[in-house]
């Protein structure tokens, strides 16, 4: 067994600058949603579809651009998972207006649990690094599930909440959405915003660590392309990913997680441990080498390569997280939707 896998196994036994909203990109989120879709019975699919037709952007986004060979039910349900990213403002050239972007809630996509570089533990001892009162993904998931369960919630609000549940269960399984790396340098004394300020190279390409993990299941760099052709292509890519993962056999440790870890907090804790053990670690178990990267702007040329071992391990980790997200989300939806 390699040093890296020994280190990961050991970890498995443990159980105001805006942050980028994306976790898995559109391909990853829709792959989760497709796995969910295939696990729901016809009754739950019908409930979901009926509810989604009350969504304020049903015609404009959820049902838009559907290919002839995909049912409206499947198309709309799978696309719920990316609506919370679609409403994100796109800058000065965004012509969609407040009718779309007012639904954007960037703080709901993540939780910044501090991961302190072990060599600097004494420096940060006893310090409060993250405001405990900040709204985060755990609060958002609890609130959205309650909205769907509550009989007096209007259907339009339930439809919006369903989209958030689909999306955030995917987000919470992305390790870099559950962490902020700290060390005693001027660049990371306030954290790296979940890898958004941490530059590396992967396969020769400079990339922020957060973005690298976002794109592990497939690249959707042109996320603002709303054309029917582009949306159909991303949908097909997501279905390919879902098909490739459908037969993935989870290891005993992952099966145990499915049985034992049933709360949003436990899912987030899993992701945090993986961020520490895999996301920010080299193949020898040392802290991953990176360079400080600006929140906006180019990543410095000095960004170091993560290496083949890191790439393989990260990909395998992402695949397992997608499968866990799909299975857990399907079961959670059955609970909140009822029979």
Predicted regions and their residues:
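Bacterial N-terminal signal peptides that target proteins for export
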Residues: 1-8
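Bacterial N-terminal signal peptides
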Residues: 8-18
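N-terminal, motif-rich segments that launch catalysis or mediate targeting to/interaction with membranes
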Residues: 22-168, 175-339
């Amino acid at each position: 067994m390699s040093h890296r896998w020994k280190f990961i196994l050991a970890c498995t036994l443990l159980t105001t600058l805006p942050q980028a909203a994306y976790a898995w990109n559109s391909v990853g989120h829709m792959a989760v949603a497709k796995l969910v879709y295939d696990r729901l019975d016809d009754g739950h699919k019908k409930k979901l579809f009926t509810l989604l037709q009350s969504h304020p952007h049903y015609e404009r986004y959820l049902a838009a651009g559907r290919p002839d060979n995909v049912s409206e039910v499947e198309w709309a349900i799978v696309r719920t998972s990316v609506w919370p990213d679609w409403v994100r403002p796109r800058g000065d050239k965004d012509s969609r207006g407040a009718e779309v972007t007012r639904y954007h809630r960037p703080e709901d996509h993540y939780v910044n649990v501090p991961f302190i570089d072990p060599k600097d533990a004494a420096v940060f001892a006893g310090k409060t690094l993250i405001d405990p009162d900040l709204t985060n993904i755990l609060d958002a998931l609890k609130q959205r599930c309650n909205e769907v369960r509550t009989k007096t919630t209007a259907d339009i609000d339930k439809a919006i909440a369903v989209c958030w549940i689909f999306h955030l269960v995917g987000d919470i399984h992305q390790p870099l959405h559950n962490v902020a790396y700290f060390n005693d340098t001027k660049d990371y004394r306030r954290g790296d915003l979940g890898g958004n300020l941490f530059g590396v190279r992967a396969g020769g390409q400079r990339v922020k660590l957060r973005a690298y993990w976002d794109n592990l299941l497939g690249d959707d760099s042109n996320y603002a392309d709303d054309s029917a052709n582009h949306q159909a292509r991303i949908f097909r890519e997501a279905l390919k990913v879902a098909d490739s993962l459908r037969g993935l056999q989870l290891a005993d440790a992952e099966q145990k997680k499915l049985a034992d870890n049933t709360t949003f907090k436990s899912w987030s804790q899993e992701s945090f441990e993986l961020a520490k053990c895999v996301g920010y670690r080299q193949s020898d178990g040392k802290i991953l080498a990176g360079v400080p990267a600006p929140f906006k702007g180019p990543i410095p040329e000095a960004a170091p390569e993560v290496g083949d071992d890191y790439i393989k391990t990260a990909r395998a980790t992402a695949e397992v997280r997608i499968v866990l997200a799909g299975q857990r989300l399907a079961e959670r939806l059955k609970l909140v939707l009822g029979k």
